Amino acid sequence: MGDSILSQAEIDALLNGDSEVKDEPTASVSGESDIRPYDPNTQRRVVRERLQALEIINERFARHFRMGLFNLLRRSPDITVGAIRIQPYHEFARNLPVPTNLNLIHLKPLRGTGLVVFSPSLVFIAVDNLFGGDGRFPTKVEGREFTHTEQRVINRMLKLALEGYSDAWKAINPLEVEYVRSEMQVKFTNITTSPNDIVVNTPFHVEIGNLTGEFNICLPFSMIEPLRELLVNPPLENSRNEDQNWRDNLVRQVQHSQLELVANFADISLRLSQILKLNPGDVLPIEKPDRIIAHVDGVPVLTSQYGTLNGQYALRIEHLINPILNSLNEEQPK
């Protein structure tokens, strides 16, 4: 019986051990609270690269569209390109006001559908300015549908936007922008297979006088992913088209240069002693040439025959000598 009695030290050890055992499940529970389920099908894709070429396209488009709005409204708008947002489609859709003009577009030959979204504030500003208003009587957004007049103004703005967006892509990768249809409710414009799919959204802020509006161009990332390398590493500004434009410009400038064409009929070799003995009235015999070679700055450029035309001496060109002149003539811009 005495052997079964525990000492105080043993009792304390058992008590401490029991408390440690009880603390362990608590620690594991707290650790489990930090664990969250991960579903690779619904998580946001990480796009770390900066889409530099798309930024260039957006800036060019803003310039084109600014000119188009000026011609439409006869007022000078100020268009600011916002930062490109790479976000899930549901985040983009839930921030859209009501009513909103949603225009579905194709960028052929890319697969997929994009959106050009005009906010109601931009539509009302355009309608007000087009009919001579100055914004003193703002239109209230009441969740209603756009009127026929507003829809016609939207169509005109959309046409300008699609033309400008197509032109903006030409220097990077030519695309054909095609209008599909228009909607007012975002539930009818599912441009992605899942609400969590990533889209590339570019906001544009339009300011006309004291009034501001906004529109967006939203493209599924899967749509432009085939051009990902091109969008991350844009071609140099001196592209082939720009090089050709520069070359044509240079050719035009060179062709307007003033040059002196010299046609020598004959050359006579004389010694210095003979030249010193020359007197007025002396005759120097020369051989009449069949053809004359004309020079520019000492460089032979053409062969010709000579004669008279309308009482003046003239040259009839037979052919160009310098091959550079032939190449310049072929490269002359139409």
From Swiss-Prot:
Q: What GO biological process terms does the UniProt entry carry, in alphabetical order?
A: bacterial-type flagellum-dependent swarming motility; bacterial-type flagellum-dependent swimming motility; chemotaxis; positive chemotaxis
Q: Which UniProt keywords apply?
A: Bacterial flagellum, Cell inner membrane, Cell membrane, Chemotaxis, Flagellar rotation, Membrane
Topology with regard to the membrane?
Peripheral membrane protein
What is one Pfam family matched by this protein?
Answer: FliM
Domain of life, source organism: Bacteria
Has keyword Lipoprotein? Answer: no
Role noted for this protein:
FliM is one of three proteins (FliG, FliN, FliM) that forms the rotor-mounted switch complex (C ring), located at the base of the basal body. This complex interacts with the CheY and CheZ chemotaxis proteins, in addition to contacting components of the motor that determine the direction of flagellar rotation.
Q: How does it associate, per the subunit comment?
A: Interacts with flagellar brake protein YcgR.
Identify the PANTHER family for this entry: FLAGELLAR MOTOR SWITCH PROTEIN FLIM
Q: Can you say what this protein is called?
A: Flagellar motor switch protein FliM
